[in-house]
Amino acid sequence: MTQLYETMYIIRPDLGEETVDQVINQYQSLLRDQGAEDVQTQHRGKRRLAYEIRKFREGIYVQMNYKAAGPLVANLQRAMRLSDEVIRYLTICQDEPDTDVEAATA
């Protein structure tokens, strides 16, 4: 059964633009190759962190929204945990959006 997920991850700020694009494409490909649907990626850019993580005060934020099964999400998180480029990640399961908007507003 597929669920709607959102994964936000932070990439090291000292990486070049080309390397950042490779990292983003790597995780998009991982999701698509394993059967994820509706993979949408938003590159949020470099931002200051609230606190220091692995001696970095800034990070490059990337957000991915997708539909996938639970085991696929576990594989994605494992890949991020083992990666040197990703300094932090968080995945949340989202509720399906209401398809009947009129019933919700009535």
Swiss-Prot record:
Alphabetic keyword roster: Ribonucleoprotein, Ribosomal protein, RNA-binding, rRNA-binding
Domain of life: Bacteria
SUPFAM superfamilies recorded: Ribosomal protein S6
A Pfam family per the record: Ribosomal_S6
Record flagged with keyword Repressor: no
One GO cellular component term: ribonucleoprotein complex
An annotated Gene Ontology molecular function: structural constituent of ribosome
Family annotation (Gene3D superfamilies): 3.30.70.60
GO biological process: translation
PANTHER family given in the database record: MITOCHONDRIAL 28S RIBOSOMAL PROTEIN S6, SMALL RIBOSOMAL SUBUNIT PROTEIN BS6M
Membership in a protein family: Belongs to the bacterial ribosomal protein bS6 family.
NCBIfam families reported for this sequence: S6
Role: Binds together with bS18 to 16S ribosomal RNA.
Name the UniProt record assigns to this protein: Small ribosomal subunit protein bS6
Gene: rpsF
